[in-house]
């Protein structure tokens, strides 16, 4: 690492006086349960005030799918950690399996349906700390 890179690293724009606002203890998180699966938020503006992103873990039970929805203020990146499913994407459909990632642009209607025998686990991330979602059903 060159000297200019070290200088830039030491010039933080965010004062780091209280690191607790930057940390999340997953043992203390609340999981939202639905008929189709669960959502656990790891980082967002509510958990970490000032966060410019939202990150969560989504579990979808076999044979189930989350409702068709879209996001008003952000795009989404979904990375499959395990399982297989069909991802509805603005009227089209694509098969997703562990190791695959899909980017969903702002305003695109989408949902994920588990077509396999094991629970889907996926990491979801949004480029806003205050994700806005509109459900169509």
Task: List each model region and its residues.
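Conserved short histidine dyad/triad with adjacent acidic residue
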Residues: 41, 56-71
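A generic "binding-loop/recognition-motif" signal
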Residues: 64, 73-74, 92, 108-109, ...
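Ligand-binding loop in jelly-roll beta-barrel domains
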Residues: 106-131
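Short acidic-glycine-tyrosine-enriched beta hairpin
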Residues: 92-106
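Conserved GNAT-family N-acetyltransferase fold
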Residues: 58, 78, 102
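Histidine-centered metal-chelating micro-motifs
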Residues: 65-67, 86, 102, 106-112
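A short, N-terminal "cap"/entry segment at the start of jelly-roll beta-barrel domains
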Residues: 2-52, 67, 134-137
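Glycine- and acidic-residue-biased ligand/ion/polar-headgroup-sensing regions
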Residues: 73-75, 80-85
């Amino acid at each position: 690492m060159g000297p200019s890179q070290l200088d830039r690293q030491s010039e933080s724009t965010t004062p780091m006086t209280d690191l607790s606002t930057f940390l999340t203890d997953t043992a203390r998180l609340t999981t939202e349960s639905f008929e189709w699966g669960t959502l656990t938020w790891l980082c967002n503006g509510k958990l970490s005030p000032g966060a410019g992103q939202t990150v969560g873990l989504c579990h979808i039970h076999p044979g189930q799918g989350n409702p068709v929805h879209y996001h008003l203020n952000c795009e989404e990146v979904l990375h499959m950690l395990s399982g297989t499913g069909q991802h509805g994407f603005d009227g089209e459909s694509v098969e997703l399996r562990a190791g695959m990632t899909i980017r969903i642009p702002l305003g695109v209607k989408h949902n994920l349906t588990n077509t396999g025998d094991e629970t889907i686990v996926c990491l979801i991330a949004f480029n806003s700390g205050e994700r806005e979602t509109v459900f169509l059903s």
